[in-house]
C-alpha cells in the first residue's frame, strides 16, 4: 500500500485535487472530516475547547461554531497554538488508525491523506508518508476563492492567509507539485500523470 500526503495553502484547491484522485481510484483519508469528528459534543477535545475558549464557541445546536472559533484563532497566535495542542494529537491518532485499518483491508491501495496543515504543523514523518503532494495557486486566486467560497472580508482573508506558511515554502518541501492556477482540465491532466506515476512505483 502506498500512503501519500496531500496538502497546500488555504483555497489552493486541495479538496478538488483530492476528489480527482478519488475519481481515479485512490482511497482518500480527509483530516478535516476526522477533525470534525474528534470535536463532536461529548468528546474530550470538545470539552477542552469549550473550557479553553468559553461558551461563545458553542453554536445553537450544541456543536462547535467553527466560524466563531476560526475568528478567535486566526486573530491570535497563542489561541491558535492552544487549539492545535488540543486537537492535533487526536487527529493524528485517528489518521494513523485509519491508515492501519486500510493496510489490513486494502493492501494494494494508493491512499491519499488530505491534511491541510501537514507542512505547517507535524510534517510527513508523523504519518509515515511515502511522499507529499503540494497543491499551489497564485495568492490572488486564493483571495478570490476565499471571497467567493466563504464570503470573508478582505481583513479576514489576509488573516487566514498569513496564519499559514506561504505556499512557496511548502512547494519547496514537496515531492510533487500540482499547479491549480489554470483550468480544471489542466489540473486534472497533472493529477492523471501523477496517478500513473504512483501506480507504476
State the predicted function of each range.
Residues 13, 32, 83, 112, ...:
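Residue-level signal for inorganic ion chemistry
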Residues 27, 131, 175-176:
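Well-ordered beta-strand positions
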Residues 33-110:
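ATP-dependent small-molecule kinase phosphotransfer cores
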Residues 46-50, 139-147, 154, 158:
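An amphipathic alpha-helix signature
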Residues 96-105, 110-148:
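ATP-dependent NMP and nucleoside kinases share a basic, alpha-helical "lid"
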